[in-house]
Amino acid sequence: MSQADFDKAAEEVKRLKTQPTDEEMLFIYSHFKQATVGDVNTDRPGLLDLKGKAKWDSWNKLKGTSKENAMKTYVEKVEELKKKYGI
C-alpha cells in the first residue's frame, strides 16, 4: 500500500455521492488517524462531547495497529464505500 494510494482514497471519500453511515464514518476516521498519527495521543473528550468520545474510542480501539496496516484497511474500506455509494 503506497502513500499515494492512501492520499487518493482520502480525497475520494470526500466525494462520495451519499454520506456513509455514522458507523462507517467512525471506521474511516479511526483508521485515518491511526495511519497518519499512530496511537491516540490526546486525552479522551469530556462527558458532554458525545461525538468526540465516539471518535476517540473508535481510534483508541486501534492502539498498537501499525500505520501501514491502518492505511491498507482504510484504502480497502474507501473502495468498498465507493462501490456502495458511488463517486
From Swiss-Prot:
<feature type="binding site">
    <location>
        <position position="14"/>
    </location>
    <ligand>
        <name>an acyl-CoA</name>
    </ligand>
</feature>
<comment type="similarity">
    <text>Belongs to the ACBP family.</text>
</comment>
<dbReference type="GO" id="GO:0001942">
    <property type="term" value="P:hair follicle development"/>
</dbReference>
<protein>
    <recommendedName>
        <fullName>Acyl-CoA-binding protein</fullName>
    </recommendedName>
</protein>
<feature type="modified residue" description="N6-succinyllysine; alternate">
    <location>
        <position position="77"/>
    </location>
</feature>
<dbReference type="GO" id="GO:0021670">
    <property type="term" value="P:lateral ventricle development"/>
</dbReference>
<dbReference type="GO" id="GO:0014009">
    <property type="term" value="P:glial cell proliferation"/>
</dbReference>
<dbReference type="GO" id="GO:0006637">
    <property type="term" value="P:acyl-CoA metabolic process"/>
</dbReference>
<dbReference type="GO" id="GO:0032228">
    <property type="term" value="P:regulation of synaptic transmission, GABAergic"/>
</dbReference>
<dbReference type="GO" id="GO:0007611">
    <property type="term" value="P:learning or memory"/>
</dbReference>
<feature type="modified residue" description="N6-malonyllysine; alternate">
    <location>
        <position position="55"/>
    </location>
</feature>
<dbReference type="GO" id="GO:0005783">
    <property type="term" value="C:endoplasmic reticulum"/>
</dbReference>
<dbReference type="GO" id="GO:0046889">
    <property type="term" value="P:positive regulation of lipid biosynthetic process"/>
</dbReference>
<dbReference type="GO" id="GO:0006631">
    <property type="term" value="P:fatty acid metabolic process"/>
</dbReference>
<feature type="modified residue" description="Phosphotyrosine">
    <location>
        <position position="29"/>
    </location>
</feature>
<dbReference type="GO" id="GO:0001662">
    <property type="term" value="P:behavioral fear response"/>
</dbReference>
<keyword id="KW-0333">Golgi apparatus</keyword>
<feature type="modified residue" description="N6-acetyllysine">
    <location>
        <position position="51"/>
    </location>
</feature>
<dbReference type="GO" id="GO:1990708">
    <property type="term" value="P:conditioned place preference"/>
</dbReference>
<feature type="binding site">
    <location>
        <position position="74"/>
    </location>
    <ligand>
        <name>an acyl-CoA</name>
    </ligand>
</feature>
<keyword id="KW-0813">Transport</keyword>
<feature type="modified residue" description="N6-acetyllysine; alternate">
    <location>
        <position position="77"/>
    </location>
</feature>
<dbReference type="GO" id="GO:0060291">
    <property type="term" value="P:long-term synaptic potentiation"/>
</dbReference>
<comment type="function">
    <text>Binds medium- and long-chain acyl-CoA esters with very high affinity and may function as an intracellular carrier of acyl-CoA esters. It is also able to displace diazepam from the benzodiazepine (BZD) recognition site located on the GABA type A receptor. It is therefore possible that this protein also acts as a neuropeptide to modulate the action of the GABA receptor.</text>
</comment>
<dbReference type="GO" id="GO:0005615">
    <property type="term" value="C:extracellular space"/>
</dbReference>
<dbReference type="InterPro" id="IPR000582">
    <property type="entry name" value="Acyl-CoA-binding_protein"/>
</dbReference>
<dbReference type="GO" id="GO:0005794">
    <property type="term" value="C:Golgi apparatus"/>
</dbReference>
<dbReference type="GO" id="GO:0008021">
    <property type="term" value="C:synaptic vesicle"/>
</dbReference>
<feature type="modified residue" description="N6-(2-hydroxyisobutyryl)lysine; alternate">
    <location>
        <position position="55"/>
    </location>
</feature>
<feature type="modified residue" description="N-acetylserine">
    <location>
        <position position="2"/>
    </location>
</feature>
<dbReference type="GO" id="GO:0030156">
    <property type="term" value="F:benzodiazepine receptor binding"/>
</dbReference>
<dbReference type="GO" id="GO:0006694">
    <property type="term" value="P:steroid biosynthetic process"/>
</dbReference>
<feature type="binding site">
    <location>
        <position position="51"/>
    </location>
    <ligand>
        <name>an acyl-CoA</name>
    </ligand>
</feature>
<feature type="modified residue" description="N6-succinyllysine">
    <location>
        <position position="17"/>
    </location>
</feature>
<comment type="subunit">
    <text>Monomer.</text>
</comment>
<feature type="binding site">
    <location>
        <begin position="29"/>
        <end position="33"/>
    </location>
    <ligand>
        <name>an acyl-CoA</name>
    </ligand>
</feature>
<keyword id="KW-0379">Hydroxylation</keyword>
<feature type="modified residue" description="N6-succinyllysine; alternate">
    <location>
        <position position="8"/>
    </location>
</feature>
<feature type="modified residue" description="N6-acetyllysine; alternate">
    <location>
        <position position="55"/>
    </location>
</feature>
<dbReference type="GO" id="GO:0042802">
    <property type="term" value="F:identical protein binding"/>
</dbReference>
<keyword id="KW-0446">Lipid-binding</keyword>
<keyword id="KW-0007">Acetylation</keyword>
